[in-house]
Amino acid sequence: MLEDKIYTLEEIRSLGIDTHEYVFMDQPGETTGTLVLKAESRTQSKRLFFSLSDGRKILTPVFWWQLSRGFQNIPTGTVLKLTYVQNSTGQIHLENAVPV
């Protein structure tokens, strides 16, 4: 299991952490998943990696305007009820993450 921290891009590369199986959520709704990894991105956002109860692996960006919601402070390994919503431009984003 990985440490409970936000990994830098360099750490992900140097540790050989493979994130290629993770994809963006493509539909709104609720699901249950375990937080596997937290990482920086090339922008001011963070990235959260979840293993969902149905076996999917989801990559979720947390944008600067979502940082106040504390998503990046959730401990790695936490099982969460995740709520994804679709915005007015059709993009899907994480609206809420509540420990189960």
Identify the residue ranges that each predicted region occupies.
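Transition segment at domain starts
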Residues: 1-20
